[in-house]
């Protein structure tokens, strides 16, 4: 892992949810989705000691029992004291461990059923949803005249740049996981949740760290810059996980600028998540509001992906159809059953591009 560092939190964009007053979702994302890093090694404060029994006050001298009885009482008293001390230490350590575990959601292998749900969404569901969602969904920014992306000498390609703590990345990963499963097979997908202290607290999602997509059509690379593990004593900071390669960094730096993203920060920097589909379609910030995933387990979300009337599914698959249309444009319409589907064709029409 790379060293930790500290940066301000800003940037990002996402649609304003229906009926939500006050600060818009777009502004909220801009204020919270810029990469956050940490200074120094992660660590927690030392645990406080437990309470040990306090001996009672001495009273007037009592008649002394026989020596053998005194020895037995002393022995049993010592055993009891040891048992109490062990119990206290156990409770203190258990409490300390629970407190530490509550500060973030660990990354663990994705359950097989969740991965299967993501990979086996019926085509009829994709088509029924198309680009129709009860929740607002932002379209990717479409570029023209740019060369196809090359990563590790392979083209076409798609690049994702985000962080495990980021709630906007949490929402976007559901759409990416479903869309990319139409073009290949996932391996080593993990589950986790966004920050427990950021907005849209503990949004359940995937982690793409260490995950791979085996696809004959597209090269996919993911960079999870930071974990969701807080750095002690540095609010809003998380431990570093992964750095972009020089090739990936050049793509991120170029296409996250205001030249290609009208809403990019004038002060520079990249908004999480940043998604570049073959230098054709750019996503900066969440496509839909992660708030709609509040209270949903991984299984709740994945098991609903086959239901085109589910509002959460509609937001995820609308975003996924937009991504699929951009990928299909890059793969020259392959695979045919995906790229000629009515859902992808509707997305391509909405984006003003061809899906073949």
Task: Identify the role of each PLM range.
Residues 157-163:
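Short glycine-rich or small-residue beta-strand-to-loop segments that form or flank ligand, phosphate
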Residues 2-157, 171-173, 181-356:
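Non-globular targeting/processing and membrane-anchoring segments
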Residues 163-174:
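Conserved redox-active cysteine motifs that mediate thiol-disulfide chemistry
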